[in-house]
């Protein structure tokens, strides 16, 4: 009886707008809401199980991104294309992984979902789970055979993305399952740099315990500490120095770390670096010392600090 009523309402809706059935994504709405009776009514009356909206999002995708397990099971049993991709390359598995719906994820994988399919940015469901901090889904995907060192089109690893979000439980899952700490993206940045650049203090602490390369160089010969100083992330700076980061490093242009702190007018950072033994008279590619740059800023406290530490022109 419920099926008959749902079917009647469905066709009333169609004819009231005088448009073709295939133009009405009613199946998608029902799938999203978990309205299994309406979904069955539409499919059993001849509706396509692979109906799409204008962005090629299918009913299975609608069900997957709303954790509608019963609807997803039914659609799959009726021949829904598990690996269908929408306009941006997302699959039902990607939607479920992004939202940490592990029951849907497991159902899709058991139904033949391809773990290696990538979206338009080069990411698999695995990467999308990592960016969302969904460590339960990550763990499941790894157990199903995904490579923990999967990269996207920019050679960014899942560990790097997890560092950006700063989700420590996710980092634990990745590292415990073989994610490599010192891999580099196309710019030469490691996972540690990703943590540093987003000022992820807890994630940085966690990563440092696992002994990544502390002075890894990117394509411009910047180290994690140089990035932290440039961005004036004092807590991160202290963490890196505690783990023996080189405070006297220069980038590929010959600019020393302390110069970035001086230009930022970060008096506390400069004071800290001095206390840790930085070369206060180091010069850059132009032969200019930190004192010269301090004078340029006209920051009296900075000038006095550097002079009191023995800074010269």
Residue ranges and their predicted role:
Residues 17-27, 144, 177, 210, ...:
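Ankyrin-repeat-protein effector appendages
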Residues 38, 70-71, 103-104, 136-137, ...:
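Conserved ankyrin/ankyrin-like repeat signature
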Residues 43-48, 73-81, 106-114, 139-147, ...:
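Ankyrin repeat domain, specifically the short helix-to-loop turn at the C-terminus of the second helix
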């Amino acid at each position: 009886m419920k099926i008959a009523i749902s079917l009647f309402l469905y066709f009333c809706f169609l004819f009231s707008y005088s448009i073709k059935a295939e133009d009405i994504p009613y199946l998608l709405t029902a799938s999203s809401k978990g309205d299994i009776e309406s979904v069955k009514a539409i499919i059993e009356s001849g509706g396509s199980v692979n109906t799409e909206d204008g962005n090629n999002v299918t009913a299975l995708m609608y069900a997957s991104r709303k954790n509608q397990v019963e609807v997803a099971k039914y659609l799959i049993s009726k021949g829904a294309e598990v690996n269908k991709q929408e306009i941006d390359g997302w699959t039902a598995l990607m939607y479920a992984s992004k939202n940490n719906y592990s029951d849907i994820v497991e159902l899709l994988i058991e139904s033949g979902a391809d773990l290696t399919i990538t979206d338009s940015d080069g990411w698999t469901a695995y990467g999308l789970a990592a960016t969302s901090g969904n460590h339960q889904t990550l763990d499941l995907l790894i157990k199903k055979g995904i490579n923990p060192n999967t990269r996207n089109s920019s050679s960014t690893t899942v560990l790097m993305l997890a560092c950006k979000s700063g989700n420590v439980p996710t980092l634990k899952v990745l590292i415990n399952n073989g994610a490599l700490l010192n891999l580099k993206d196309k710019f030469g940045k490691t996972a540690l740099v990703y943590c540093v650049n987003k000022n992820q203090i807890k994630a940085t602490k966690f990563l440092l315990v696992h002994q990544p390369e502390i002075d890894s160089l990117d394509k411009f010969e910047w180290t994690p500490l140089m990035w932290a100083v440039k961005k004036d992330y004092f807590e991160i700076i202290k963490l890196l120095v505690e783990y023996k980061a080189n405070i006297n490093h220069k980038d590929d242009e010959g600019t020393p770390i302390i110069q970035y702190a001086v230009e930022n007018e970060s008096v506390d950072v400069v004071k800290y670096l001095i206390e840790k033994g930085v070369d206060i008279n180091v010069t850059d590619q132009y032969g200019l010392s930190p004192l010269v740059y301090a004078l340029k800023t006209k920051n009296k406290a900075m000038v006095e600090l550097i002079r009191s530490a023995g800074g010269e022109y």
